[in-house]
Amino acid sequence: MCRLFGMSGGAHRVRATFWLLEAPDSLAAQSRREPDGTGVGCFDEHGRPLVYKQPLAAYEDKEFAQEARELCSRTFIAHIRYASTGAIAPQNTHPFEQHDRLFAHNGVIEDLPALERELGEQLSLVHGDTDSERYFALITREIERGGDIGRGIISAVEWVAEHLPVFAVNFV
């Protein structure tokens, strides 16, 4: 099972070093059981998304350790991967970025051909082979259709629940 991390510093730019590297249950420590990829995403001082990821376990990834110590942001998303769908490769490592939003997912969504048919031209947002990135593309499409983030998320989750075999749709 993948592991998710999300943190908001509110109005303040903060570091996530403790939770990513130093805590007894840090993502680096948990990656010994979830070794298939590590990523961290945040936003720079101008609100632009930044994503750093490798198809390596966090405890082995020197760049992850450096990023965890140096990055300062109001919002962090991090993910360690236990691959269920898609190869162990950079393009399948979370978090993903679409239209200036970041996304990481824990769970399994099946019947990807049905999801791809539903996505239509939005499938062009997908660069890897994971169910997660396709799920994010559906959320992105629904947000763009209605212009409301909350309603877009609800609409996408409802479509997935109604049409696809799902084991979990947890995401940050």
Region annotations inferred by a language model:
Residues 13, 69, 122, 144, ...:
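Small-residue-biased structural context
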Residues 1-57, 76:
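Extreme N-terminus nucleophile/cap motif
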Residues 7-10, 79-82, 106:
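Fold-independent oxyanion-binding glycine-rich loops
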Residues 2, 101-111:
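Conserved beta-strand-loop-short alpha-helix elements that form
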Residues 116-142:
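Long, charge-dense
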Residues 40, 107, 135, 171:
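Residue-level signal for inorganic ion chemistry
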Residues 146-172:
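Catalytic core of PPM/PP2C metal-dependent serine/threonine phosphatase domains
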Residues 24, 55-66, 78-100, 117-121:
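Short acidic (Asp/Glu) patches
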